[in-house]
Each structure stands twice: as C-alpha cells, then as structure tokens.
C-alpha cells in the first residue's frame, strides 16, 4: 500500500533476543525478497549488533544506526552541571574511523539521534533527529514489571506474558526534570523544537540534520 501511494517506509527493529532470532531472520529474508521483486530499497533501523549483522547480509536494505546503538550521555540534570561541557556535544560517531567501520562492515551511513536539550555536533551523513521525547536510559528487561512484581526495579527478568502495568502506572520524578519511567526506559521531554519550530528546524538543518522524526 505504501509503495502504491508513493510513501517511503522505514522499519525500526528492537533489540534482538535469542528466542526471536529465527523469526527476525525470516522477516528480513521476506523483506529482502520483496525488495528484489519490486526493485525497491528499504530503510532498516537497527538497535543491536545482531540485527545489524543480519541486515548487512542482505543487499536491498539501507541500514541505519538506531538510537539504542548511537550512545551518548542524555540526562535532564545535565543543564545544572558547571564547567566545560564541550565533550557532551560529541560521541563516537564524530570519529571518522568509526563511521568508516560501520559503512564497511554493516553498510551503515545513516544515523538516528535524539533532541535532548543540549547542543550537539552532528557528523557528515544522513542524520535523523527524534523529538520532543528522548530516552535517558533503557534496560534490557522491564523495570516497571520488576518494581510491581518484585518490589525492586533492579530485580529484572525476561517477561513472557506482559500484564501491561505501563497502561496504569509509571515511575515519577520531580516536575522540573520533565521525565518519567515507563516500560523498560526513562523518557524525558526536550520542548525546544516546539517553542520555536521554524528557527530551531533551520538551525538543526544547517548543522547536518536531514530528517526530523516526531515521536
């Protein structure tokens, strides 16, 4: 349907669990075959190295580095820090040799970023910026489930039958931090793009952002 209506589709893959490996391989193979039959390229966003390796084996994908692999320090309390903050503006993707490694080994030359209320220096390439929410950290297993069942968010285990606690409950934090905990993540709000969208959009675009993703 998207192809008929001339929409470009991007598929975002979660962290690959071992029990989901064969299912993921089958899905990637099916998508690759479809792309070959229709002479299309499909953008795949990967969030772990296992999925990146599987996607790199196929020739009809444009592989993009997801936000869970594009690691950097993100915390609403950073604005209270004093001293030199220059190193917060860069991460590993600003190193050319690392981008070369990603391109040669996984075919990755597209990168997903998050707006988190702090200046960033973007590298060359296809950069996408997610806004206005960002993840400060993400656990492999659900911290909310661990708190509700075990009384300790650190006592995490793999959930096979989700009771959907997150529909009714969340971790709350002081209002000035503009953050909350839900699912296996902590989410925070960076409202700068909403306050002056035209000006902020032009500023980000001038510094290497090619696409904005409303989340």
Region spans (language model):
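Active-site pocket-lining/capping segments in soluble small-molecule metabolic enzymes
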Residues: 1, 7-215
